[in-house]
């Protein structure tokens, strides 16, 4: 089963928080976007 995308905080309190979210999102799309053979 595919996990849900990371939850987006309503407000990013720091640059690190934003970067972590973007990194998790990229990881999520890398997993989800992988072709199924």
Swiss-Prot record:
Record-linked SMART domains: PAH
Protein source organism: Conus betulinus (Beech cone)
Protein name, per record: Neuropeptide Y2-like conopeptide
Entry GO CC: extracellular region
GO MF: hormone activity; toxin activity
Tissue specificity annotation: Expressed by the venom duct.
This protein's record includes keyword Secreted: yes
Additional information: The mature peptide does not contain cysteine residue.
Lineage, uppermost ranks: Eukaryota, Metazoa, Spiralia, Lophotrochozoa, Mollusca
Family: Belongs to the NPY family.
Keyword set includes Secreted: yes
Function: Causes hyperactivity such as jumping, rapid circling and tail flicking, after intraventicular injection into mouse brain.
Main localization of the protein described in the UniProt heading: secreted
Residue numbers carrying Tyrosine amide: 37
Record keywords, A-Z: Amidation, Neurotoxin, Secreted, Toxin
Compartments where located: Secreted
